[in-house]
């Protein structure tokens, strides 16, 4: 997975710790301003900030769904597993000495640890794994994140002006990936970029209407 991601972003400059607070326009460019007053200039802006995208407009139909994953320290037997398991939950092969199990679904934006979710993840381990490989759990950890879901469980892309009703200066939105961002994001990003550069979409008009933000408004 890491090699796939690295290949996607090989020509991308990543700027961290830039908490965007405001975007203004001047001379055909968007001025992106952070909380310290630092500025970046961009011809095109794409908002892809998960459930926090609702800060752009109350009309955006995104539902926050928090999820907790559990990390279990691999043992001598489990380290040899070369397969991931999916059974309502998921159980990954070891990465950097830990397996990942998850994830819970809670209809809120709470990122606090929940013992009930931790136990549910651990108890979800299939019996054949528990009996033969994970009969003794020695160490566990966790991570809680928030998914951005839509009412029809499908992502969206489009122009910000479709959402706000106000003309935007090349500002777009891409979101609603839910728990399937790794699958959906590359495809939806390609559709959005194709739209931005006024190229021919690889999908027909009926399918386009089912994928854009307009279907949710």
Predicted regions and their residues:
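Core beta-strand elements of the Rossmann-like FAD/NAD(P) dinucleotide-binding domain
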Residues: 35-44
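Short beta-strand to alpha-helix junction loop
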Residues: 1-7, 112-117, 179, 183
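Helix-loop-beta segment of a Rossmann-like dinucleotide-binding subdomain
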Residues: 1-10, 17, 104-108, 169-176
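A conserved short coil-to-beta-strand element within the FAD-binding core of flavoproteins
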Residues: 15-31
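General small-molecule cofactor/ligand-binding pocket signal
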Residues: 13-17, 138-141
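Active-site substrate-recognition segment that forms the wall
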Residues: 44, 49-169
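C-terminal catalytic lobe of FAD-dependent flavoproteins
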Residues: 135-217
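Internal, well-ordered alpha-helical segments in soluble enzyme and binding-protein domains
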Residues: 1-8, 16-19, 66, 87, ...
């Amino acid at each position: 997975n890491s090699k796939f991601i690295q290949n996607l972003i090989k020509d991308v400059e990543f700027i961290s710790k830039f908490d965007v607070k405001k975007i203004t326009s001047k001379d055909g460019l968007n001025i992106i301003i952070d909380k310290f007053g630092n500025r970046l200039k961009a011809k095109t802006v794409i908002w892809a900030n998960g459930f926090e995208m609702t800060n752009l407009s109350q009309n955006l139909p995104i539902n926050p769904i928090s999820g907790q994953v559990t990390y279990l320290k691999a043992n001598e037997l489990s380290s040899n597993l070369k397969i991931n398991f999916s059974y309502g939950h998921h159980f990954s092969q070891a990465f950097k000495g830990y397996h990942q199990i998850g994830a819970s679904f809670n209809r809120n934006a709470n990122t606090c640890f929940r013992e009930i979710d931790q136990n549910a993840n651990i108890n979800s381990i299939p019996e054949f794994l528990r009996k033969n490989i994970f009969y003794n759990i020695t160490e566990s950890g966790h991570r809680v994140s928030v998914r951005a879901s839509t009412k029809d469980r499908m992502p969206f892309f489009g122009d910000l002006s479709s959402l706000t009703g106000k003309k935007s200066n090349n500002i777009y939105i891409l979101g609603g990936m839910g728990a399937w961002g790794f699958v959906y994001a590359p495809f939806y990003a390609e559709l959005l970029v194709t739209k931005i550069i006024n190229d021919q979409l690889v999908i027909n008009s009926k399918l386009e209407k089912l994928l854009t933000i307009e279907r949710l408004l």
